[in-house]
């Protein structure tokens, strides 16, 4: 029987060999954390390689994602559908083993990591989801949700500011099933960290309210085993296990040096490591005995079967709860969702209200949350401004309301957004979280990661323009809406009234293949009249709100607007119409959605032969030239805002009927 060290060495040599074959990669972390991984995966991790999506599996997150060959080796050795050929294709085009772990490629990879600090933050989201789901569904004698979240992280993750945001909140919420392993090797890309990272990490995490197990020898299986047992025994606090490790362990000449962090070791050094660790096998060769000891398929199938029996007993005792649990973990919307949400939208159209779109957003949350117990809302300490609370909101605390549906994220925009991604990845919830649009800048990379991972995270942004007013340019978004529109696979909405706001929320809820950004105003907006056809076309991202005639060829001019500027466009159209100009007004709440429509529909809204166009939006002007062309004009922002009442700012920056009419006449 192979020893623990030999089992860990299988990880080390698969990692060395794959990085060497790829001619790039990071061998140091997998070699340094191999002993920790061997103990965790073989002695504790509850998982089934034959079903990577088992609802009650433990979650494992590699926050230091550059060490991706660690998780690929673990998945391969444990019996997941990841072959030795897949490992040989490490970092190659269209392989299942990209340079950093990517969700949706190798089965068993729970989240995309690489941007340091986001993995530990996703893990906090996973742990929140587990705890909340357990309190919502578990009943005495029926614990159908009962799993841990394990995360590996390194010095880089702890240096990133987002780790403070996430770990602070994790301690406050008492996430007892979150267990983190800190790869304390004192090395980063630039060398030994003594020159730039001398924090007392133990005291830092104790101050957060974590249970900390310090000074564990990361190459001593017995110490690691005991540390995990202690961590599991502490159920009221998250645990940080500080593992002293040697980066590149087993490399005679490069271990404990940044030389092995982010580059292949080289053939000579790998040969020396083989001799040093007494590994007599060829590259990518693993003895059958080691494969047999690593194989977790049978153990995993037994564990899942036992859980299925628990679920069957639960279904017998609580049939309605069991059906609801199954619906939610399968990410299915309620049977009455489509009809009820559409009825709400039609009710709004029939009952006009000139309200701020942030208030319209709150009304949509109120209506939809009653249909969607899977909603898990929140705000970055701006609930009274973002208007994210509804009558049934139940804020989650460490002990009270552990079965709640709302998270007070505090002033943690980046942390909130990456936590939401973890919640979405875990399953059972649709997370939404809000802040001012200006502060999406703090969270931009987490929004991008949601889009990359195709997760249904709903990012809510209010106070969307110079309409914010007196708080001034530090708080007034200019380029942010366009920046969001440019993120691939993110659908961004900027609705013009309560109806478009409700449609935007509905579209975001129904979109399973990616996130949405919902952008709302501080100021009141006039509701637009619509026919049934126009109402149906709102969901297409752009539609003709004002016709000048039935003939497609008739417009002299097209005005395109979003959000608070749609009313301006309609008023300008009336002025021009009175002067004999035939004007079409297009409301385009989501350029991303509109661009996905078929060519015939897009042509029906924006006929290519009508080149006289003006776009109006209180955001950066440059974005709109793709719609107005060289002959068109844009009424937009080309500078930062100012501190003044909103009406003065709109006049100052040209968002007036008079200026729109003047711009239009200049091209007619």
From Swiss-Prot:
Q: What class of enzyme is it?
A: transferase
Q: Which CDD domains match?
A: TPP_PYR_DXS_TK_like, TPP_TK
| A Pfam family annotated for this UniProt entry | Transket_pyr
* Site (Important for catalytic activity): residue numbering on this chain: 26, 261
One MF term from GO for this chain? transketolase activity
Q: Which InterPro entries match?
A: THDP-binding, Transketo_C/PFOR_II, Transketolase-like_C_2, Transketolase-like_Pyr-bd, Transketolase_bac-like, Transketolase_BS, Transketolase_CS, Transketolase_fam
The record's comment on cofactor binding reads: Binds 1 Mg(2+) ion per subunit. Can also utilize other divalent metal cations, such as Ca(2+), Mn(2+) and Co(2+). Binds 1 thiamine pyrophosphate per subunit.
Which residues are involved in binding Mg(2+)? Answer: 155, 185, 187
Q: Which reaction does it catalyse?
A: D-sedoheptulose 7-phosphate + D-glyceraldehyde 3-phosphate = aldehydo-D-ribose 5-phosphate + D-xylulose 5-phosphate
A GO BP term here is: pentose-phosphate shunt
Detail which positions bind thiamine diphosphate. 66, 114-116, 156, 185, 261, 439
Q: What is its EC number?
A: 2.2.1.1
Q: Which cofactor does it need?
A: Mg(2+); Ca(2+); Mn(2+); Co(2+)
List of residues binding substrate: 26, 261, 358, 385, 463, 471, 522
Q: Which GO terms describe its cellular component?
A: cytosol
Name the SUPFAM superfamilies on file.
Thiamin diphosphate-binding fold (THDP-binding), TK C-terminal domain-like
Q: Which UniProt keywords apply?
A: Calcium, Magnesium, Metal-binding, Thiamine pyrophosphate, Transferase
Please list the residues that make up the active site.
413 (proton donor)
Annotated NCBIfam families? tktlase_bact
List the PANTHER family hit by this protein, alphabetically.
Answer: TRANSKETOLASE, TRANSKETOLASE 1-RELATED
Outline the subunit composition: Homodimer.
Q: Which family does it belong to?
A: Belongs to the transketolase family.
- What's this protein's function? Catalyzes the transfer of a two-carbon ketol group from a ketose donor to an aldose acceptor, via a covalent intermediate with the cofactor thiamine pyrophosphate.
Q: What is this protein called?
A: Transketolase 1
The gene behind this protein is tktA
């Amino acid at each position: 029987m192979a020893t623990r060290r030999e089992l860990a060495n299988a990880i080390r040599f698969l990692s060395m060999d794959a990085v060497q074959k790829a001619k790039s990669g990071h061998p140091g972390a997998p070699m340094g954390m191999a002993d920790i991984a061997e103990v965790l995966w073989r002695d504790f991790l509850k998982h089934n390689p034959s079903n990577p999506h088992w609802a009650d599996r433990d979650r494992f997150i590699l926050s230091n994602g550059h060490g991706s060959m660690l998780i690929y080796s673990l998945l391969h050795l444990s019996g997941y559908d990841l072959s030795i050929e897949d490992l040989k294709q490490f970092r190659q085009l269209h392989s299942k083993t990209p340079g950093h772990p990517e969700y949706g490629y190798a089965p068993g990879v729970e989240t995309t990591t690489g941007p340091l600090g986001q993995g530990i933050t996703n893990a906090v989201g996973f742990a929140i989801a587990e705890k909340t789901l357990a309190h919502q569904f578990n009943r005495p004698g029926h614990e159908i949700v009962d799993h841990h979240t394990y995360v590996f992280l390194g010095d880089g993750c702890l240096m990133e500011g987002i780790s403070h945001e996430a770990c602070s909140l994790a301690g406050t919420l008492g996430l007892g099933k979150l267990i983190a392993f800190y790869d304390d090797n004192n090395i980063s890309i630039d060398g030994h960290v003594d020159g730039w990272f001398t924090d007392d990490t133990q005291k830092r995490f104790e101050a957060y309210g974590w249970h900390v197990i310090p000074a564990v020898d990361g190459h001593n299986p017995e110490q690691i085993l005991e540390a995990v047992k202690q961590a599991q025994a502490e159920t009221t606090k998250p645990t940080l296990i500080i593992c002293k490790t040697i980066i590149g362990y087993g490399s005679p000449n490069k271990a404990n040096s940044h030389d092995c962090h982010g580059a292949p070791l080289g053939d000579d050094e790998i040969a020396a490591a083989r001799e040093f660790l007494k590994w007599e096998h060829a590259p990518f060769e693993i003895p059958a005995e080691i494969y047999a000891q690593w194989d977790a398929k049978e153990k995993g199938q037994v564990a899942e079967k036992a859980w299925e029996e628990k679920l069957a007993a639960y279904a017998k005792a609580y049939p309605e709860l069991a059906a609801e649990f199954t619906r939610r973990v399968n990410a299915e919307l309620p049977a009455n969702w489509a009809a009820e949400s559409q009825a709400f939208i039609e009710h709004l159209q029939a009952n006009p209200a000139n309200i701020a779109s942030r208030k319209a957003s709150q009304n949509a949350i109120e209506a939809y949350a009653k249909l969607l117990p899977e909603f898990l809302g929140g705000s970055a300490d701006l609930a009274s401004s973002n208007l994210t609370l509804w009558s049934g909101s139940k804020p989650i605390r460490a002990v009270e309301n552990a079965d709640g549906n709302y998270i007070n994220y505090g002033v943690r925009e980046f942390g909130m957004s990456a936590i939401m991604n973890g919640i979405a990845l875990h399953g059972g919830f649709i997370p939404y979280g809000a802040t001012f649009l200006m502060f999406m800048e703090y969270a931009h990379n987490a929004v991008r990661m949601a889009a990359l991972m195709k997760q249904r995270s709903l990012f809510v942004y209010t106070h969307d323009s110079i309409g914010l007013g007196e708080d001034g340019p530090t708080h007034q978004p200019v380029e942010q809406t366009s920046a969001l529109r440019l993120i691939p696979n993110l659908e961004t909405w900027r609705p013009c009234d309560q109806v478009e706001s409700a449609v935007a929320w509905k579209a975001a809820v129904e979109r399973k293949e990616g996130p949405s950004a919902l952008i709302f105003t501080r100021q009141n907006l006039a509701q637009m009249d619509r026919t049934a056809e126009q109402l149906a076309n709102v969901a297409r991202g752009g539609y003709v709100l004002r016709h000048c005639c039935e003939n497609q060829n008739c417009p002299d001019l097209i005005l395109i607007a979003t959000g608070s500027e749609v009313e301006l466009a309609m008023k300008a159209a009336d002025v021009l119409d009175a002067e004999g100009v035939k004007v079409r007004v297009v409301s385009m709440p989501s350029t991303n959605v509109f661009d996905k429509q078929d060519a015939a529909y897009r042509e029906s809204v924006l006929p290519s032969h009508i080149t006289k166009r003006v776009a109006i939006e209180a955001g950066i002007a440059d974005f709109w030239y793709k719609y107005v062309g060289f002959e068109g004009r844009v009424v937009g922002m080309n500078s930062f805002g100012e501190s003044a009442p909103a009406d003065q700012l709109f006049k100052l920056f040209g968002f007036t009927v008079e200026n729109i009419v003047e711009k239009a006449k200049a091209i007619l």
